[in-house]
């Protein structure tokens, strides 16, 4: 495993050294529409809709597959920022919207519901696998790269470990991933983590309740009272997310969905970027992931950067997003020579 002291690479802006400012800055200040997508809706093997948002370029150019975080979408600013950089390289980009996360492009606050009685979860790699295999079959000589942030990073890392012999994805980048879901969930019950937790639960609770309203099969699995009253990730996952997706409970879900046990099996060149001040992760989570990482993983930790932050630049009006730039630079290293 290549371990880099990434302080050689990343310096937060002098004006934004706080982990919490790093975490919220992009969402608070970047435009909600950075790119203009072309939308495709694919039918999944289980008979559902999978919404993919594309940035096009010339046929045959490399494709970057992007996976968003918890309660995000293709319109999450870090996904749009990454794909904007992809387009500047003359490459193509495609953002996968996890089930129940796709947005109406005309009204970004409006969720587009799926047909199946389910939502999404941190260990669900089936849709990523479907997209990779479909693209590889359609364009067998086109280089594919994959980027995942937060929950999407956990999904990507788990998929890479589940498929150690895969050759379709040439390289991957994982940013701010909660490799140990149990440790992350417990960490978010403390201090300011409770603020972030309530922010997420503010959309997760009604989404689960709406799924129960729409689908009798979902209502039969979800504990509606406990879902309404959930104040922590563990309580929500145990009442709704885990049983809805076939897990015995939150602990079973965390154990089976965490990417940590899969890191040792990864053979694809993979860049893992994390900050030790990430308010979503305890430091022990990153240390355990670093120890477990295979030799194919370049594990980069920074002292600062928050959660999917890594905001630099000389001033607030001259901002640079280091993780997005670093991920694309890593893909450049593994792209075929022109």
Question: Which residues does each predicted region cover?
Answer:
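Catalytic nucleophile-loop/oxyanion-hole region of alpha/beta-hydrolase
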Residues: 99-145, 318
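Alpha/beta-hydrolase-fold enzymes
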Residues: 137-244
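N-terminal cap/lid segment of alpha/beta-hydrolase-fold proteins
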Residues: 19-57, 311-317
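Catalytic histidine neighborhood in serine/cysteine hydrolases
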Residues: 292-309
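Active-site nucleophile elbow and catalytic-triad environment of alpha/beta-hydrolase enzymes
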Residues: 239-262
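Catalytic active-site module of serine/aspartate enzymes centered on a nucleophile-bearing elbow/loop
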Residues: 305, 314-338
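Short, surface-exposed "cap/lid" segments of acyl-processing enzymes
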Residues: 55-110
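Short beta-strand/loop motif that positions the catalytic acidic residue
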Residues: 266, 272-274
């Amino acid at each position: 495993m290549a371990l880099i002291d990434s302080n050689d690479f990343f310096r937060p802006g002098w004006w934004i050294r706080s982990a919490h400012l790093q975490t919220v800055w992009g969402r608070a200040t970047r435009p909600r529409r950075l790119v203009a997508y072309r939308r495709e809706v694919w039918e999944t093997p289980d008979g559902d809709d999978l919404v993919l948002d594309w940035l096009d370029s010339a046929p045959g150019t490399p494709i970057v597959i992007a996976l968003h975080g918890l309660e995000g979408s293709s319109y999450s600013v870090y996904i749009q920022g990454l794909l904007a950089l992809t387009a500047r390289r003359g490459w193509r980009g495609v953002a996968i919207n996890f089930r129940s996360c796709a947005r109406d492009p005309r009204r970004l606050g409006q969720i587009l519901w799926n047909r199946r009685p389910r939502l999404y979860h941190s260990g669900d790699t089936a849709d990523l696998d479907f997209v990779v295999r479909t693209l590889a079959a359609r364009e067998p000589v086109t280089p594919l790269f994959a980027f995942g942030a937060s929950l999407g990073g956990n999904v990507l890392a788990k998929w890479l470990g589940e498929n150690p012999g895969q050759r379709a994805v040439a390289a991957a980048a994982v940013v701010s991933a909660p490799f140990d879901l149990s440790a992350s969930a417990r960490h978010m019950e403390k201090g300011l983590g409770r603020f972030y937790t309530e922010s997420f639960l503010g959309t997760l609770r009604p989404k689960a309740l709406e799924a129960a309203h729409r689908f009798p099969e979902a209502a039969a699995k979800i504990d509606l009272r406990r879902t309404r009253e959930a104040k922590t990730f563990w309580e929500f996952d145990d009442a709704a997310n885990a049983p809805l997706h076939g897990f015995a409970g939150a602990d079973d879900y965390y154990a089976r969905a965490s990417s940590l046990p899969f890191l040792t099996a990864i053979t694809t060149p993979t860049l893992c970027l994390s900050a030790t001040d990430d308010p979503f992760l305890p430091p022990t989570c990153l240390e355990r992931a670093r120890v477990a990482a295979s030799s194919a993983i370049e594990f980069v930790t920074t002292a600062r950067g928050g959660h999917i932050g890594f905001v630099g630049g000389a001033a607030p009006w001259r901002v640079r997003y280091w993780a997005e730039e670093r991920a694309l630079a890593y893909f450049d290293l593994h792209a075929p020579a022109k």
